[in-house]
Amino acid sequence: MPKIKTNRAAAKRFKKTGSGKYKFRKANASHILTKKTTKRKRSLRLDQIIGASDLKEVKRLLPNG
């Protein structure tokens, strides 16, 4: 029986928190920032928690946490 492999693309994007939830960074915060408002850029700095609809798929991609 082969080992279960972690999806490396997902591993780079999602991190498991201490409480078992998964956090990720929002998109659109790396370049072309001059036309974005300060409020929008400030909200993009915050990490987000995976929603219930995506949680099952992320757990499948990251079997080892």
Swiss-Prot record:
Organism: Desulforapulum autotrophicum (strain ATCC 43914 / DSM 3382 / VKM B-1955 / HRM2) (Desulfobacterium autotrophicum)
Keywords of this entry: Ribonucleoprotein, Ribosomal protein
UniProt GO cellular component terms: cytosolic large ribosomal subunit
Xref: InterPro entries: Ribosomal_bL35 (IPR001706), Ribosomal_bL35-like (IPR021137), Ribosomal_bL35_CS (IPR018265), Ribosomal_bL35_sf (IPR037229)
Assigned protein family: Belongs to the bacterial ribosomal protein bL35 family.
Coiled coil: none
Keyword Protease: no
Record carries keyword Ribosomal protein: yes
GO biological process: translation
Classification of source organism: Bacteria, Pseudomonadati, Thermodesulfobacteriota, Desulfobacteria, Desulfobacterales
Xref: NCBIfam families: rpmI_bact (TIGR00001)
Gene coding for it: rpmI
Molecular-function GO terms, alphabetical: structural constituent of ribosome
Name of the protein this chain belongs to: Large ribosomal subunit protein bL35
